[in-house]
Amino acid sequence: MADVTINADEVRSALNDFAASYDPGNVERVEVGRVSSAADGIAHVEGLPSVMANELLKFENGVLGLALNLDTRDIGVVVLGDFQGIEEGQEVHRTGEVLSVPVGEGYLGRVVDPLGEPLDDLGPIATDGRRELELQAPGVTMRKSVHEPLQTGIKAIDAMIPIGRGQRQLIIGDRQTGKTAIAVDAILNQRSNWESGDVEKQVRCIYVAVGQKASTIAAVRQTLEDNGALEYTTIVAAPASESAGLKYLAPYAGSAIGQHWMYGGKHVLIVFDDLSKQAEAYRAVSLLLRRPPGREAYPGDVFYLHSRLLERCAKLSDELGAGSMTGLPIIETKANDVSAFIPTNVISITDGQIFLQSDLFNANQRPAVDVGISVSRVGGAAQVKAMKKVSGTLKLDLASYRSMQAFAMFASDLDAASRQQLTRGERLMELLKQPQYTPYPVADQVVSIWAGTTGQLDDVDVANVADFERALLDQVRRTTNVMDSINSTGKLEDDAVAALKTAVAEVKRDFHGSKHGIEPGVEEHESLGATAVNQETIVKK
């Protein structure tokens, strides 16, 4: 038998040739993990060593999950969908994609979930692409100062707490104080801008409902549809029945849809209703993922949860198209406690707050805006000049009225100046009352506020202020061009003021002898006792 001779060089050469000529074809590397445990909307997955933070994972039954915790031994995954079909031992596959939502004009008039899927049974949505949920907010050099007004149609807000395009204005108050009503009114007030067809005026609206009752969301949608506002509005719905993961993601989904329009040079108004429930959902997710709790059991990064969301609202520079996204986040307080953890966080992030008082609401002062602690830090620069001119003393007059009210409760005699403050204040408070879902055009607001702050209503009975206001606005529309002048120039000229005074005199003349009460010379009446003060508007904390 011949001896076998092995030449190492030949073996090495043969192996090298084989390796060089090997063609794997279409074989691809696939990582497969398995569910090690699953409970309460959270799944722990083992065996995916290369997974990215916030990557989408697909479970065996087709449900998607979001990788939030990347631990040494396993991955904490938030299930985005039906949790019931996920069991221990099921396979989990990587998708290689981070969470994103479809975007585009097709979303106007639709109701969608936080993943962008339609919920209104109106068929598929035509999209222009996708946008990631976790994107950096515009930088300092990408922004421009807020200088364009965004009218809400609410006299108390547009006069004293003005909002500009690109601003973040918090709406805060106890439950059932009219927070959602203010946000919906702001959406309804954009209808005339939308119908104008002018891209510079049009405002696309997004209403993000987090943790609300499904019936409440349906009622908001019906209100928008009945008032012709649904055609320029998108509703992102994560009702109370949804999982904590979807409620946590809903505001980011709405923001991504709005950012697509903002970077396209358009103007957007987005309402987050409400961020308290988003924070609670994020707390639930974090505790289930075994993240260490902090104050009120919220995780340590709960401030970042809201700051990275609200910082996406901006007024972009001219180089980026000059688009804007205005944010109206809503926060619910407990017993008017604005010093709680989440309220103080969001107050520090936003550019101002509109504080709604339950005592004012119960006293029939609606909208129940507490002008004493409500503020707009940047909106004043965007206020219409005519409104700024007529509302300059409004906040001061109301503050004097509030302080004098408390004094009048115990005083048996008041001097003429004090009686005048009470007279003016009562009528201003009545003037600021406004029915729900009836936003006022800015020109109407200017005329109404002018009548109140210049004392034109001082001799009108408090009970008839609303009727007098309607009659005055009708008279001004019919007999003058003041409204057109305000709309075109944004100013209230001297000749317009003279025309308004003439209109007031004519309306008062019509009121004489009718059922409406005119109280000529109120300031000359004898002293008013405590019983003469309108007690229902007194709020003493």
Swiss-Prot record:
Membrane topology, from the record: Peripheral membrane protein
Binding site for ATP: G173, D174, R175, Q176, T177, G178, K179, T180
Site (Required for activity): S374
Entries under InterPro entries matching the protein: ATP_synth_asu-like_sf, ATP_synth_asu_C, ATP_synth_asu_C_sf, ATP_synth_F1_a_nt-bd_dom, ATP_synth_F1_asu, ATPase_a/bsu_AS, ATPase_F1/V1/A1_a/bsu_N, ATPase_F1/V1/A1_a/bsu_N_sf
CDD domains xrefs: ATP-synt_F1_alpha_C (cd18113), ATP-synt_F1_alpha_N (cd18116), F1-ATPase_alpha_CD (cd01132)
Comp. bias (Polar residues): 532-541
Cysteine pairings via disulfide bonds: none
Coiled-coil regions listed: none
Record keyword Transport present: yes
Gene3D superfamilies xref list: 2.40.30.20, ATP synthase alpha/beta chain, C-terminal domain (1.20.150.20), P-loop containing nucleotide triphosphate hydrolases (3.40.50.300)
Cell location: Cell membrane
Start and end residues of each stretch annotated as Disordered: 517-541
One MF term in the entry's GO annotations: ATP binding
Keywords assigned by UniProt, alphabetized: ATP synthesis, ATP-binding, Cell membrane, CF(1), Hydrogen ion transport, Ion transport, Membrane, Nucleotide-binding, Translocase, Transport
Family listed: Belongs to the ATPase alpha/beta chains family.
Record's subunit section: F-type ATPases have 2 components, CF(1) - the catalytic core - and CF(0) - the membrane proton channel. CF(1) has five subunits: alpha(3), beta(3), gamma(1), delta(1), epsilon(1). CF(0) has three main subunits: a(1), b(2) and c(9-12). The alpha and beta chains form an alternating ring which encloses part of the gamma chain. CF(1) is attached to CF(0) by a central stalk formed by the gamma and epsilon chains, while a peripheral stalk is formed by the delta and b chains.
Function: Produces ATP from ADP in the presence of a proton gradient across the membrane. The alpha chain is a regulatory subunit.
Name of the molecule in the record: ATP synthase subunit alpha
Upper lineage: Bacteria, Bacillati, Actinomycetota, Actinomycetes, Micrococcales
